[in-house]
Structures are given as structure tokens and as C-alpha cells.
Curated annotation (Swiss-Prot):
Protein name: Putative integrase/recombinase y4rC
CDD domains per the UniProt record, alphabetical: INT_RitC_C_like
Family as reported in the entry's similarity comment: Belongs to the 'phage' integrase family.
Protein keywords: DNA integration, DNA recombination, DNA-binding, Plasmid, Transposable element, Viral genome integration, Virus entry into host cell
MF terms in GO: DNA binding
Record organism: Sinorhizobium fredii (strain NBRC 101917 / NGR234)
Pfam families in the record: Phage_int_SAM_1 (PF02899), Phage_integrase (PF00589)
All residue ranges annotated as the Core-binding (CB) domain in the record: 5-98
GO biological process assignments: DNA integration; DNA recombination; establishment of integrated proviral latency; symbiont entry into host cell; viral genome integration into host DNA
Length: 332
């Protein structure tokens, strides 16, 4: 008979040993996994009427996890993509458990067999050049926060950094002179360097002359000298989008996020004829195939432009099957 295994020590060792020591996971990954398990434990507490510290491993089984994921999507309204990210964190923990408590392999395999939910992948959303220009002009550069926000937006749209990467930048991560660039630790603890345009270099040089706030050396700190929070960044973007929409009305109905600015940079590179492999390196993608979404967006733009043109006249020579079965297959 399989003995009971307490969940608490196993989950603690997963975070402390597997994620932090062995994998050296980024703070962003750790916080994402932490949030997943906080939500899962609260759900299990309501469902099983037991405090998290008293839960046994075998109680976190496949049916409970599926119910948890369904609850996130249906009751809390998270997207399918977010649901799948939660499942990825749970799968990672159960793969770790497979080595630590192999006697529970049957339960572990059932959890690992829970598939990600399929969803329709939408085309990427990005800003046009007039929209970007209006957004960059929005901050009031007569104030400290306005100068910070202008520099932040310029770096975001010119480098395509992720939210966690740009808020984690330190002043020491900037390198000027010939080949001016910034250094960033991205996904998977991989370091990459991203070059600056001359205009960005000038703005950042001036920004570094500002009195430093806080003692952490953060490049874009909050007013208290701390790292900008996710909500703080989104508040900043919403404020400047609202101001910029007076100059560029098309911004009125758009949601501006750091991720959308990242998409904007990628589209600029692609439309300038930059190879997809270079774009993948620039953005820190593990695979060139990830940049396919930008190519698909470009094709969609071309198709929309084609639809507005006057088509040349000509007779269609498309084959018309006279067989009912072939007609059925062609209709699928």
C-alpha cells in the first residue's frame, strides 16, 4: 500500500531546490509558479475543507486539477493561454515529484496526461508609426516622472524587451560608446545584448544624469526608488495612451501594453526586411518558429491591402468536381 506523502515539504523543496538552485529560474518564473500554487491550494482548501499545510500529495489528483483549471477559466474568466500557463507550472511540479516519490507514479502520470487546451491563435496586435510617435510625445518631460516615462517607452519600443526584463534593468546594464547596447537576462537565464539607436543613446545618457532614487541602481525606478510593479507600468501606459490619443485618434480604442510594444518592434524589423533568425535573437526567442506570428500578421496586412484594390478581370479556370464524394471532400 502506498504511504501518504505530505504536500508541503515536497512543494517547498520544488521551489527552493529545483527552481531556485538547480534551474536558477528567473524571479518572473518563480512568481508565476508561486501564484499558480497559491490559487491551487486555495481551491483545494475550499474543495477538500483542509488547510493547505495538512494536504497530502495524493489529494491533488487529476480530477481536482482539471476542476481547478475549469474554475479559473469559467468563474474567474482567465484566458485559455493563461490556463495553459497554470497547467505548465503544475506539470513541472509533478515531473519533479516523479523523482522524489516514484511510488506515486500512477497518480503523477495521470496529471501529466492532462492536455493543454487548444485555442484559436489571433494575429499579433501592434502600433503604427504615428501611434508610436504620439505615445513617445505624451510624457511631460519637464517633470522627473515624465522624463523617466519617455525613456522607458523609447527603450521598450526600440528594444522589444519583455515587461520583467525592462523593469529589472539596472543602470550598470547600459553600455555606451561604439556599439552602444544594453545587457539583459531573459527567459531561461539567457543573457543577450540589444543595440541602441543614436537617438535612444542620447536620451539614456541624459536620463543617467538624473539624481538616482533608491540604492538598488534600478534604471527605471518608482518615485520611491523601487522596481516598477506590473500595475505601475500599466497605469503609466494607460495614462500616456489617453494623452496620445488626442494626437493619434486610432489609439483611443487600443490597449497599450509592454507586450504590444514588443510586437511593434518585431513588426518594424520584419517590414524592414530583417531575417527572422535575427528577429528571434533580438527578442530572445528560443526558436525561429516563434517569429512566424509576425510573418502571418504581415501577410494579413497585405491581403487587406489587396482586397482594397480593383481586381483584374479574367475567367476562373478552377476545377469543378462532378462527383458527389469529391464535392463533399472539397467542402470540408
Amino acid at each position: 500500500m502506498t504511504k501518504h506523502a505530505s504536500l508541503a515539504p515536497l512543494l517547498e523543496s520544488f521551489f527552493l531546490q529545483r527552481l531556485m538552485q538547480q534551474r536558477q529560474a528567473s524571479p518572473h518564473t518563480i512568481s508565476s509558479y508561486r501564484d499558480t500554487f497559491r490559487q491551487l491550494l486555495k481551491f483545494a482548501e475550499r474543495r477538500l475543507r483542509k488547510p493547505p499545510s495538512r494536504l497530502n500529495f495524493e489529494e491533488i489528483d487529476a480530477p481536482l486539477i482539471v476542476a481547478f483549471l475549469d474554475d479559473l477559466e469559467n468563474r474567474q474568466g482567465i484566458s485559455v493561454r493563461s490556463r495553459n500557463l497554470r497547467l505548465t507550472a503544475i506539470h513541472s511540479f509533478f515531473r519533479y515529484a516523479a523523482f522524489e516519490i516514484p511510488e506515486h507514479s500512477a497518480q503523477i502520470q495521470r496529471v501529466l496526461a492532462i492536455p493543454s487546451k487548444r485555442f484559436t491563435r489571433t494575429l499579433v496586435n501592434f502600433l503604427t508609426r504615428p501611434e508610436v510617435d504620439a505615445l513617445l510625445a505624451a510624457p511631460d518631460r519637464s517633470t522627473w516622472s515624465g522624463r523617466r516615462d519617455h525613456a522607458f517607452l523609447l527603450v521598450a519600443v526600440q528594444t522589444g524587451l519583455r515587461l520583467s526584463e525592462i523593469t529589472g534593468l539596472k543602470r550598470d546594464d547600459l553600455f555606451f560608446g561604439t556599439g552602444a547596447h544594453l545587457r539583459v537576462i531573459g527567459k531561461g537565464r539567457k543573457e543577450r545584448c540589444t543595440p541602441f539607436a543614436k537617438s535612444t543613446t542620447a536620451v539614456l545618457r541624459n536620463w543617467l544624469k538624473e539624481p538616482q532614487r533608491g540604492d538598488q541602481g534600478i534604471l527605471f525606478p518608482s518615485a520611491r526608488g523601487e522596481r516598477l510593479s506590473v500595475h505601475g507600468v500599466q497605469y503609466m501606459l494607460n495614462k500616456h495612451r489617453q494623452i496620445a490619443s488626442a494626437m493619434s485618434p486610432s489609439l483611443e480604442g487600443k490597449r497599450v501594453t509592454v507586450h504590444r510594444l514588443r510586437h511593434t518592434m518585431a513588426m518594424d524589423l520584419l517590414q524592414a526586411g530583417v531575417d527572422r533568425a535575427v528577429i528571434a535573437l533580438w527578442l530572445g526567442h528560443e526558436s525561429v518558429e516563434t517569429t512566424q506570428i509576425y510573418l502571418e500578421a504581415t501577410l494579413a496586412m497585405k491581403e487587406a491591402a489587396l482586397a482594397k484594390t480593383s481586381p483584374y478581370s479574367g475567367k476562373s479556370s478552377r476545377f469543378r468536381p462532378d462527383d458527389n464524394l469529391l464535392a463533399f471532400l472539397n467542402s470540408l
